[in-house]
Amino acid sequence: MIRFLILAGYFELGMYLQLSGKLDRYINSHYSYLAYISMALSFILALVQLTIWMKRLKMHSHLSGKAAKFFSPIILAIPVFIGLLVPTVPLDSTTVSAKGYHFPLAAGSTTSGTSSDGTRVQYLKPDTSLYFTKSAYQKEMRATLKKYKGSGKLQITTQNYMEVMEIIYLFPDEFKNRQIEYVGFIYNDPKDKNSQFLFRFGIIHCIADSGVYGLLTTGGQTHYQNNTWVTVSGKLAIEYNQNLKQTLPVLHISQSSQTMQPKNPYVYRVF
């Protein structure tokens, strides 16, 4: 009976995350089919366990000892309780500060690329090179650059946010003096009051490889508070940042306006 309840709990957890829209805060929305597969398997296995319990069938068990029989169901049930009871809070600039984010320094620095809790994080530029061979990655990025190369206004949307940010950092000269417009939340640079980052939290595959991506902005007439969602438009320049000790693409804002937070504040990498 306990096995049936645990498996039914996994099915209900999947339903809850899907119907509440919270599943998108854990995995790339393009992988939601995996959640449906998991729900279907949990439901089928739950029915199997219910049948075994009702017919009182004797099944072979590899568990030996009272401690193993006691703790194994508890361990399996923990994710269900966490998923159902722990509130899901969207990541924002408070998270950026609380996790002790330090933006990447120039090559050769001693910064390890991990946050204060020991997890690997990505900053500013999405990096999908880990998922390709070197030649395949270069080919993929060149093909992506070809899609957005030009002199007209570049509109960065929720759908293309991750791939556009990646090629802007890889090929900044191709976008120099280009008019760019996009939406993000404000994160004030603690070391420079005149500079603000405009970010979105992005997920490549799941929350474990998530990062905060966007551009350093300057020149805006209005100084916004942290977590303010803003639509900005301006020209991209390439400048050396003294604090980060590297050359970065910087958006010189010509227009900005406060906007509502999107229903889903996250962006996802589409492959």
Swiss-Prot record:
Primary location class: membrane
InterPro entries from the UniProt entry: DUF1980 (IPR015402), DUF1980_C (IPR048447), DUF1980_N (IPR048493), UPF0703_membrane_permease (IPR052955)
Effect of inactivating the gene: SMU_746c-SMU_747c deletion affects biofilm formation in a medium- and pH-dependent manner. Mutants show a reduced ability to grow in acidified medium, but they survive both short-term or long-term acid stress. Mutants have lower glycolytic activity. Deletion does not affect membrane proton permeability.
Keyword Secreted: no
GO biological process: amino acid transport
Localisation per UniProt entry: Cell membrane
Keywords of the record: Amino-acid transport, Cell membrane, Membrane, Transmembrane, Transmembrane helix, Transport
GO cellular component terms attached to this protein's record: plasma membrane
Pfam families hit by this protein: DUF1980 (PF09323), DUF1980_C (PF21537)
Membrane-spanning parts: 34-54, 70-90
Membrane topology: Multi-pass membrane protein
Cysteine pairs bridged by disulfides in the record: none
Keyword Cell membrane: yes
Similarity field: Belongs to the UPF0703 family.
Subunit record text: Interacts with SMU_747c.
Function noted in UniProt: Could be part of a two-component membrane permease system responsible for amino acid transport under low pH. Involved in acidogenesis, biofilm formation and low-pH survival.
This protein's name: Putative two-component membrane permease complex subunit SMU_746c
